[in-house]
């Protein structure tokens, strides 16, 4: 039995609330149970130096946790003077995931920066961030199309992410913090709306896990991401 009493194949309650920041070109508050991530997508004219003159844009991401996102207050990374390795890993993952479904040439020499700030953490912050980031990016690119800033829709497909793990010997979908902390194995899956793989991160935490267990986790992920893609479409109006 899961601590939350959910069935093994059941997501936490998920909401993707849009328009939560009046200034950003696109914004979303992604809530997966008690995990809440505020995402904004902002247009910046110009691109990083390595892309100048190449006629294409860029999508990048930044990720951070508010000091009281967890049970005890953590120091702001800015106050420490450097980002943790975890932060750098997660924001690179978010950026890669978004770029996998964007036609960068359609942006011209412009950059969209997607900021993902964890307001409250109860497991699955990176997967919630990716799922909400696509919503914010979709809204931002639609705004740019409507304003005539770009002429072609750069969004090629949806992308969403979910965690799965082996908990008490059972493959389960969408781990909360208690499950994640006690999982025998866990994995993060990033898939497109078409079902293509963008990234899989899988780790045996307390033991190795079998190919059959991995296939069970992958099947759960496909089911969960299918449901998340439906919620993304509903949040963005199709």
Curated annotation (Swiss-Prot):
<keyword id="KW-0698">rRNA processing</keyword>
<dbReference type="GO" id="GO:0000049">
    <property type="term" value="F:tRNA binding"/>
</dbReference>
<dbReference type="GO" id="GO:0000175">
    <property type="term" value="F:3'-5'-RNA exonuclease activity"/>
</dbReference>
<dbReference type="GO" id="GO:0006364">
    <property type="term" value="P:rRNA processing"/>
</dbReference>
<dbReference type="InterPro" id="IPR036345">
    <property type="entry name" value="ExoRNase_PH_dom2_sf"/>
</dbReference>
<dbReference type="GO" id="GO:0016075">
    <property type="term" value="P:rRNA catabolic process"/>
</dbReference>
<dbReference type="InterPro" id="IPR050080">
    <property type="entry name" value="RNase_PH"/>
</dbReference>
<dbReference type="InterPro" id="IPR027408">
    <property type="entry name" value="PNPase/RNase_PH_dom_sf"/>
</dbReference>
<feature type="binding site">
    <location>
        <begin position="124"/>
        <end position="126"/>
    </location>
    <ligand>
        <name>phosphate</name>
    </ligand>
</feature>
<keyword id="KW-0694">RNA-binding</keyword>
<dbReference type="InterPro" id="IPR015847">
    <property type="entry name" value="ExoRNase_PH_dom2"/>
</dbReference>
<dbReference type="InterPro" id="IPR018336">
    <property type="entry name" value="RNase_PH_CS"/>
</dbReference>
<comment type="function">
    <text>Phosphorolytic 3'-5' exoribonuclease that plays an important role in tRNA 3'-end maturation. Removes nucleotide residues following the 3'-CCA terminus of tRNAs; can also add nucleotides to the ends of RNA molecules by using nucleoside diphosphates as substrates, but this may not be physiologically important. Probably plays a role in initiation of 16S rRNA degradation (leading to ribosome degradation) during starvation.</text>
</comment>
<keyword id="KW-0819">tRNA processing</keyword>
<keyword id="KW-0548">Nucleotidyltransferase</keyword>
<protein>
    <recommendedName>
        <fullName>Ribonuclease PH</fullName>
        <ecNumber>2.7.7.56</ecNumber>
    </recommendedName>
</protein>
<dbReference type="InterPro" id="IPR002381">
    <property type="entry name" value="RNase_PH_bac-type"/>
</dbReference>
<feature type="binding site">
    <location>
        <position position="86"/>
    </location>
    <ligand>
        <name>phosphate</name>
    </ligand>
</feature>
<comment type="similarity">
    <text>Belongs to the RNase PH family.</text>
</comment>
<comment type="subunit">
    <text>Homohexameric ring arranged as a trimer of dimers.</text>
</comment>
<dbReference type="Pfam" id="PF01138">
    <property type="entry name" value="RNase_PH"/>
</dbReference>
<dbReference type="GO" id="GO:0008033">
    <property type="term" value="P:tRNA processing"/>
</dbReference>
<dbReference type="InterPro" id="IPR001247">
    <property type="entry name" value="ExoRNase_PH_dom1"/>
</dbReference>
<keyword id="KW-0820">tRNA-binding</keyword>
<dbReference type="InterPro" id="IPR020568">
    <property type="entry name" value="Ribosomal_Su5_D2-typ_SF"/>
</dbReference>
<keyword id="KW-0808">Transferase</keyword>
<dbReference type="GO" id="GO:0009022">
    <property type="term" value="F:tRNA nucleotidyltransferase activity"/>
</dbReference>
<dbReference type="Pfam" id="PF03725">
    <property type="entry name" value="RNase_PH_C"/>
</dbReference>
